Amino acid sequence: MSEFLPFSRPAMGVEELAAVKEVLESGWITTGPKNQALEQAFCQLTGNQHAIAVSSATAGMHITLMALEIGKGDEVITPSLTWVSTLNMISLLGATPVMVDVDRDTLMVTPEAIESAITPRTKAIIPVHYAGAPADIDAIRAIGERYGIAVIEDAAHAVGTYYKGRHIGAKGTAIFSFHAIKNITCAEGGLIVTDNENLARQLRMLKFHGLGVDAYDRQTWGRAPQAEVLTPGYKYNLTDINAAIALTQLAKLEHLNTRRREIAQQYQQALAALPFQPLSLPAWPHVHAWHLFIIRVDEQRCGISRDALMEALKERGIGTGLHFRAAHTQKYYRERCPTLSLPNTEWNSERICSLPLFPDMTTADADRVITALQQLAGQ
């Protein structure tokens, strides 16, 4: 059998090793100059005013919700078709996640679904830029402005995604992920961008014990060594080891995403003759980052179920992913929302399958996946 082809693999090279070596030899390995450089680089990439690096996108979501004073009695609108960390953070703060449906073919949450879910208790809206494509963020942001509700963009899939000529996160507040399977990675990490100066100040405190300054800030600016707690906070800072890797990856972003796009185009061309249905692309002008390439496997149409297809691909040495099982079908949320019905979400959650897609894949790797799909179609 051929070597196992994973669903994803980080694209690491000698540059990342050199970046880590530089940090280790510098004597400053925790939050410091590399964090500052990463934050500045993301302000430049997105065009936004403030950037706050954190230990994960989940941490970023947690402190953003906290900074917006979301808590007991509040509601936060989010698609169910998302990673459960968003709903977990909402729930842990005592608020209620209000899960809404998505468009059947793009899997994007729609402005109409969001607006129909708004109540007097709605405190925030969290749209997801799904799989590397952008949601209709202008329309969603307009709803937030009309009702006076905060919009927090889940941009975990969207490093390199553009909407109407502007990078995701160009305005408002957005949260990016540097997890191992993301378009750029530092193993674990995340970053928040915002144009709200007061929010940025609160996020910096909340990510580091509630202190007004961190250790590097005190050393660099000669501020008093006895930092004062201004509010209870967390330990969500990113180390400079991680930040150095993320910076190195960011310098490669165009190359990495170009390769992802090439593989996606190879899949798209082949799938035109197969019963497996890829996602539709959004109608608005955009640049797709191709974080994921997803097909829908409808048993009646394809002659094989999604789960059977994934198992058959595994037997052929090909890995796959599932992004995502609908959150409202998970035990904790199912018990709390037993009557919730989201038809488009449920239909897709039972059929979606993420194919291998990462920059170090070869054309032959993609051909191998395509050949397997051709063999399995109609079985």
UniProtKB/Swiss-Prot annotation:
Function recorded in the entry: Catalyzes the conversion of UDP-4-keto-arabinose (UDP-Ara4O) to UDP-4-amino-4-deoxy-L-arabinose (UDP-L-Ara4N). The modified arabinose is attached to lipid A and is required for resistance to polymyxin and cationic antimicrobial peptides.
Q: Which one of the record's GO molecular function terms can you name?
A: pyridoxal phosphate binding
Residues with the modification N6-(pyridoxal phosphate)lysine, per the entry, are 182
Q: What is this protein called?
A: UDP-4-amino-4-deoxy-L-arabinose--oxoglutarate aminotransferase
Task: Report quaternary structure and partners.
Answer: Homodimer.
Which superkingdom does the taxonomy of this entry point to?
Bacteria
Obligatory cofactor(s): pyridoxal 5'-phosphate
The UniProt entry's coiled-coil ranges are: none
Q: What is catalyzed by this enzyme? A: UDP-4-amino-4-deoxy-beta-L-arabinose + 2-oxoglutarate = UDP-beta-L-threo-pentopyranos-4-ulose + L-glutamate
Q: Specify the species.
A: Escherichia coli O7:K1 (strain IAI39 / ExPEC)
- Quote the cellular component terms of the Gene Ontology held in the record: membrane
Q: What is its EC number?
A: 2.6.1.87
Keyword annotations for this protein, in alphabetical order, are:
Aminotransferase, Antibiotic resistance, Lipid A biosynthesis, Lipid biosynthesis, Lipid metabolism, Lipopolysaccharide biosynthesis, Pyridoxal phosphate, Transferase
Q: In which pathway does it act?
A: Nucleotide-sugar biosynthesis; UDP-4-deoxy-4-formamido-beta-L-arabinose biosynthesis; UDP-4-deoxy-4-formamido-beta-L-arabinose from UDP-alpha-D-glucuronate: step 2/3; Bacterial outer membrane biogenesis; lipopolysaccharide biosynthesis
A GO BP term here is:
lipid A biosynthetic process
